[in-house]
Amino acid sequence: MTIGVLILAKLYVVGTGPGDISKITAEALAALKKCEVIVGYTVYTDIIKKFLPNKKYVSTPMTKEKDRCLLAYKYAETENTAIICSGDAGVYGMAGLVIELKHLFKNVELTIIPGVTAALSGGALLGSPLTADFAVISLSDLLTPYELIQKRIRCAAQGDFVICIYNPSAKNAADI
């Protein structure tokens, strides 16, 4: 006999686009409107707060990603909650960590809402859309060893890929 898990509320992982509210998708905006609580990095919650002021906002500083995810899950146990990130939630966003922690919160239903990435938006803005093969590489060594970042850049360059660089102001970026 299988006993079901009671789903009390929902957690949305929402990519809010490249920073300009006009670039947020209709699906992302609809999900945010359904939520009572919006959790995110302080800079991102401040952007959304201007357009959806009647929500409860919970923010954490940079480098507190795991704490942010756990807070979002805690709120989602009783209220519809969104955890927001810039760009797409699956591209250097929060989706991976939220999924990794899901086993701790079986009674929370999880939905991931994609967003427009900075790479795609930037290409369009520059008049050089990414229409062929390309690579996206972060210069941050917080989660990826410096040597691996260098190897990825070399391999992408050897493959003649357009390379979209994320985190160009990372501490080690000048050395790469």
How would you name each of these model-derived features?
Residues I47, S138, K171:
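Positions that flank functional sites
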